[in-house]
Amino acid sequence: MSIQSILRKETLKKKDKNIDLQENNINDLVVSASRVIAPLWPISTFAAHHPWMGLEKQSFERVANWLKEARNVDIYPSASMIHSAKAKGEIEESFLQMALSRWLDSQSFHIPRKKVEQFCQAALKLEELPSSLLSSPQLNKLAEEMSYINTESMKDSFLQPVSSFIENQKGENLSDILNYHIIKWCKLYLDDSGSSWTMPNREQGLYRAWHHLIKFDPALSKTERKVLKDWPEDALIALTKALSELGISESNMQAYLEGHLLSLPGWAGMVRWRSQQSIEEQELLIEYLAVRLSMELAVVKPYLPLKNQKVEKKVSIVPLIASWIYWGDISTREWLQMSATEQSELLAFAYRFDENIRKKLWLEAWEQTHAEQLKKKISSKQRATNDKKRVVAQLAFCIDVRSEPFRRHLEKLGPFETFGIAGFFGLPIATTELGSNDSHPSLPVILKPKHQIKELTDENECKSYEQRKMVGSSVRYTFKTMKQNVLTSMLLPEVSGPLLGLQMVTRSFVPRRVGGFIRNLRKNMLQKPDTTFSLNHVHDTNCEIPIGFTKEEKVNYVRQALKMVGLTEGFAPLVVMCGHSSQSTNNPYAAALECGACGGAAGGFNARVFATLCNLPEVREALSAEGIKIPDDTIFAAAEHKTTVDELEWIYVPELSETAQEAFDCIEAIMPNVSQHANRERLMQLPNFKTKIKNPSKEAHRFAEDWSEIRPEWGLARNASFIIGQRELTQDCDLEGRAFLHNYDWKQDERGDILANIIAGPGTVAQWINLQYYASTVAPHYYGSGNKTTQTVTAGLGVMQGNASDLLPGLPWQSVMQSDRETYHSPLRLLIVIQAPTKYIEHLLNNDFTFREKVQNGWVRLASVDPEGRWKNW
């Protein structure tokens, strides 16, 4: 504990002796409460995350029940989604019956099994109880006569913010007014777009800046400003005082703070992310809560004290009786003839077999159907691993699900072998591109960079390039400054109108031609020179992390990646490391379509660095001494897979050997054909195309350049599985672009370390992506971001609906929905399939407690395929 924390703690004790902070101080409570929200990255570096990452110690079912009761957020698929999936053959009835039987076997009840099964079968149709039945006088009279039934065990109580209980004279809920104020202050403080007018005293932190300004806020009444007139200047003291004056007992503090964090999970998530980025803002979440609760006290103080701040959800027996009448064929006469014990037993069972349980069983059946279909695909394509065709080139792609169709068509049309690996290629680097002073952590967000890699060129070439780049930057800066200035903003439409009007017309009616022209013009004007990298280790005191790698680190990273995919022998003349990137116009979510393993950036930089390392003589010599012999005529190159147009762009091609040149020419010859096939398959999934596409590549480019296009590609929608194993396991299988594919050879992993690293790194990234798509599909109003066409990009951070909503944390409607009524993404929890002997899986689960917890608590599903091809569900 720091000296400042100790002094602050002592001050707190002197200020308010009613609150004992000896063990559970506010700092600890805020940290514990923050588990209910996930960090939210800025939209420019949209990083995959799932909203329940802090809740994985609890079961998925328990979190689902808690969210339903406490926030009325349903995280199971809706009835319409389930019915649609069943109609499309995605759910087999037999698996639903198996799930029901398992659940019934786990329950204790004294009702005839046949009667229970009849009730459950009818309830599982997911039909709403008729309103005529629920409101019928007969039913309500029966419920009155059964009022002696004890339902205390069915009650739940939840602590809610005080403001949520109160309405003002205009009928406005005070929590909505509070949210309005908090959104305003968050936008001011967190603004990352370089506004001309910034928040005064921003450098002192959120709370102090707010404290200086709140006394002048015209949106507050005199009474409200009076409450805050002599308010503490320290955030922690203010938070403690607010909790005390709101009447929150110490035992309820964490739950109360959780309620406030969940009120605006987007803004709170952004605050949490910022608090993790620098020491200066490490207490930002405390400051946020201090501002929020201080404002709440000011708003609600005239209404205090309240009699009860807990929401008690007393169970009505009316719908429970109605459910047995409608689904169990028990008449009102039969109810009256039962004993109180029998009545209680039926009501208790109906209460347990609620909507969440019914949807849970459907979800399990849906997931089991998918697993069975995947199992059949894999087993039908089993082949001997030693019967390999001769390959002229090997290409390593990111595990991203969009790589799967491209790899499949590439292998089908030529003598090529492909591999799957995390798109950062195991390089924990921060990248600095030529002419830039900013670095980007080009690795999964769960990791921290260990090396800084800079793009370099000749000094004169660099100056010339920077000057050309400065011209474009100056134009953008001037436009932005004019737009944000009070006077020049009125002149700007007159000056820029004709040019922007022309751009609007041409971009709308001939997007492919205009987009291509602008892209080529930009490329020709910049004329980026040939570059190298700062690969050799340099300790720069101005950098937090060292520049480049030592010789040992170079060898280690190359060895690690090659072993991870099982490529330690049988090298082809040409080995291509393929990063990936997306291409879209006027798209705030562009980063969401980039490489998740590279922190929301294109993966080409990492691919090029890795290929360069593999070509270094000192690296090859060291690997050869360890038994990894790369032939002299084998050359490593780098390319970038453009997922929106399914093209391969070469970004690093060193001098090639004769055999490598032949392989390169072979790839170039068949690539247009590969792109045509991959584009046709992908475009046919989009809602715009239901008929034959004459020129798939042309259409794909139109989508990429059309600035009115709300869905340039599906991204990672419909992802459902992560397959870890040799390519032979899935080769020739049409996995429909739904599987993350990571190469793995258990025979080269005696201790299981490689498998553990795959699960801890790429496995976690895949799980986060999967649950982000899941959450945005099942609860779009809470975890998604609504319709793209009505979004407002705010403060350079993210999007809102209008100008006073929560910062929307998830994916837009267009990323997961086919139409207003039909989903495209299937909300299934990720199925991880590992090709390895059973003992490897047992070793993994015994040694990786975090992963075992995820499997046991239902956050991921796990299956394995042993060397004999036997499938096992864990």
From Swiss-Prot:
Needed cofactors: Zn(2+)
InterPro entries referenced in this protein's UniProt entry, alphabetically: DabA
Principal location listed in the UniProt entry: membrane
Amino-acid positions noted as binding Zn(2+) in the UniProt annotation, renumbered to this chain: C398, D400, H580, C595
Compartment annotation: Cell membrane
Keywords noted in UniProt: Cell membrane, Membrane, Metal-binding, Transport, Zinc
GO molecular function, one term: zinc ion binding
Keyword Membrane: yes
Entry superkingdom: Bacteria
A Pfam family assignment: DabA
Disulfide bonds, paired cysteine numbers: none
Membrane-topology annotation of the record: Peripheral membrane protein
CC annotations in GO: plasma membrane
Protein purpose: Part of an energy-coupled inorganic carbon pump.
Assembly and binders: Forms a complex with DabB.
Protein family: Belongs to the inorganic carbon transporter (TC 9.A.2) DabA family.
Protein name per UniProt: Probable inorganic carbon transporter subunit DabA
Organism: Bacillus cereus (strain 03BB102)
